[in-house]
């Protein structure tokens, strides 16, 4: 154990303390004796010496106990209400609604899985985030509501059983940033960031660095703030009666209908898209919707339910900030930095990489079909619907509604839509993002765009667009579809854009 000059996949971006300058691995203390020291009231242990574990093994009867992170009021026949902090025993764990029994009342029923956490574990701690990537940790900590010193501990992406500490900090050159520290494991089950001081558990580690920075970039202030999760959709409610929906506020009107904010059964806030009669076959729509509801990913707008009698209703999760193309033009959208704009692009690429992996096609990828949450999370909407539209103004390339400026040449000329034509559209979407919602090919009509594309023309680099981002756009606009990159590649480049293109990493302290 100790400095052995062997690298670790995460070491090049992790902040570490007391490390070898060559290999970045913790320096082995010269004295290997099992000395016990006390520092700021905490016991300090030698990280290179085995200590007998003091924690008794967990009882198998505790494995199915959970604790409520939020209160929940029952709203369905068969679900179970509970208060924050209440303990429950899980009887059946299936899907997003788990059958449970309250240890307080003895009653049984179904509970939303995302309102509870495993008892006698780290999961109920407000600073612990399970299954969170490094990039999503940065997004969470940089979201509104968090400040200098906000922090979280997450599971390591690359090393099972290990953890990482992520802390929001301020840098004079870069502004608000997130620093990451690897939390290393002791043989006896303890933890340390610096070998100068070790802790029997993560609670003690958090307590220590909350009192003093002690070598970290800043003192830990408070756990990363998150919103109360939305309860999962009740699984049996797919084709729902129109009367269960109350339309409250019209959010917008598109070519094929209107979008409303509303409530389902007076308790669940939803978005409702009402399609104009005759815009698509109800039978074809229901078949496609059954496929669409199987596509579930954090970067895709969740499809909840449908009304299949005309006018067709599509019920989805509600996104507070509306469409990306509109949000980019608001005062809040105009203030977004290039880093945040690139992060939004990375989120969209992540969602499209999932669609790519599932051998699905969007067909109408543009900023108008990306929705934005109040925490600036982006999700892809309306995937797959374009091919169902029975409107010649949309399906014919000469039609006024056909989105020529976003469509790949092979799709315009031959009607050939593939995931690679979606990649072309993504390149156009990147121009919308970097110009805060400007219409592509400014000053050109649709026929002029078609003529220019046939001559090999490509949109010029927009103002304030980094050269490296324009290079990525040009890759998306390769003439031969097979020469265009995958969405997974686009995601990887955009997630670490300045790192990937300039090789800049956070320096080791």
Curated annotation (Swiss-Prot):
Domain SH2 positions: 127-224
Domain annotation SH3: ranges: 61-121
Residue numbers binding ATP: 251-259, 273
Modified residue annotations for Phosphotyrosine: 192, 394, 505
GO cellular component, one term: plasma membrane
Compartments it resides in: Cell membrane; Cytoplasm, Cytosol
EC number: 2.7.10.2
Matches recorded under SMART domains: SH2 (SM00252), SH3 (SM00326), TyrKc (SM00219)
CDD domains: PTKc_Lck_Blk, SH2_Src_Lck, SH3_Lck
SUBUNIT field: Binds to the cytoplasmic domain of cell surface receptors, such as AXL, CD2, CD4, CD5, CD8, CD44, CD45 and CD122. Also binds to effector molecules, such as PI4K, VAV1, RASA1, FYB1 and to other protein kinases including CDK1, RAF1, ZAP70 and SYK. Binds to phosphatidylinositol 3'-kinase (PI3K) from T-lymphocytes through its SH3 domain and to the tyrosine phosphorylated form of KHDRBS1/p70 through its SH2 domain. Interacts with SQSTM1. Interacts with phosphorylated LIME1. LIME1. Interacts with CBLB and PTPRH. Interacts with RUNX3.
Functional summary from the UniProt entry: Non-receptor tyrosine-protein kinase that plays an essential role in the selection and maturation of developing T-cells in the thymus and in the function of mature T-cells. Plays a key role in T-cell antigen receptor (TCR)-linked signal transduction pathways. Constitutively associated with the cytoplasmic portions of the CD4 and CD8 surface receptors.
Protein name, per record: Tyrosine-protein kinase Lck
Gene behind the chain: LCK
């Amino acid at each position: 154990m100790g400095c052995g000059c062997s690298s670790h996949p995460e070491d090049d971006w992790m902040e570490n303390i007391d490390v070898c300058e060559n290999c970045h691995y913790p320096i082995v203390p010269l004295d290997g004796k099992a000395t016990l020291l006390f520092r700021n009231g905490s016991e300090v242990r030698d990280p290179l010496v085995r200590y007998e574990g003091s924690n008794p093994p967990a009882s198998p009867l505790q494995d199915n106990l959970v604790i409520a992170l939020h209160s929940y009021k029952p709203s369905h026949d068969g679900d179970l209400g509970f208060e924050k902090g209440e303990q429950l025993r899980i009887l059946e764990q299936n899907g997003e609604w788990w059958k449970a029994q309250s240890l307080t009342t003895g009653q049984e029923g179904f509970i939303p899985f995302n309102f509870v956490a495993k008892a006698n574990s780290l999961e109920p701690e407000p600073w612990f985030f399970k299954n969170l990537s490094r990039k999503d940790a940065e997004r969470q900590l940089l979201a509104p509501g968090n400040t200098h010193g906000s922090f979280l501990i997450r599971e390591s992406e690359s090393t099972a059983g290990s953890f990482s500490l992520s802390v929001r900090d301020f840098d004079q050159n870069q502004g608000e940033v997130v620093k990451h520290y690897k939390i290393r494991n002791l043989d006896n089950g303890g933890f340390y960031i610096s070998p100068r001081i070790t802790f029997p558990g993560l609670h003690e580690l958090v307590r220590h660095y909350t009192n003093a920075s002690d070598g970290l970039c800043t003192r830990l202030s408070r756990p990363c703030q998150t919103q109360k999760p939305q309860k999962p959709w009740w699984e049996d409610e797919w084709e729902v009666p129109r009367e269960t929906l109350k339309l409250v506020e019209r959010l917008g009107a598109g070519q094929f209908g209107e979008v409303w904010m509303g409530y389902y059964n007076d308790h669940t806030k939803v978005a409702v898209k009402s399609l104009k009669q005759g815009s698509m076959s109800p039978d074809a729509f229901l078949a496609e919707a059954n496929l669409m509801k199987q596509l579930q990913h954090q970067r895709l707008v969740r499809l909840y339910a449908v009304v299949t009698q005309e006018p067709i209703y599509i019920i989805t999760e509600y996104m507070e900030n509306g469409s990306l193309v509109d949000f980019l033009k608001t005062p809040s959208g105009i203030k977004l930095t290039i880093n945040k704009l690139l992060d939004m692009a990375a989120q969209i690429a992540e969602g499209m990489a999932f669609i790519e992996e599932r051998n699905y096609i969007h067909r109408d990828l543009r900023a108008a079909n990306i929705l934005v949450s109040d925490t600036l999370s982006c999700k892809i909407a309306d995937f797959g619907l374009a091919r169902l539209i029975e409107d010649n103004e949309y399906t014919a390339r000469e039609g006024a509604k056909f989105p020529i400026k976003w469509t790949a040449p092979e799709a315009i000329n031959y009607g050939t839509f593939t995931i690679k034509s979606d990649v072309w559209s993504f390149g156009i979407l990147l121009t919308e993002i970097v110009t805060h919602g400007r219409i592509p090919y400014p000053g050109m009509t649709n026929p002029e765009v078609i003529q220019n594309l046939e001559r090999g023309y490509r949109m010029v680099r927009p103002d304030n667009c980094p050269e490296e981002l324009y290079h990525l756009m040009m890759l998306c606009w390769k003439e031969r579809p097979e020469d265009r990159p995958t969405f997974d590649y686009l995601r990887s480049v955009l997630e670490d854009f300045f790192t990937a293109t300039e090789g800049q990493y956070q320096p080791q302290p």
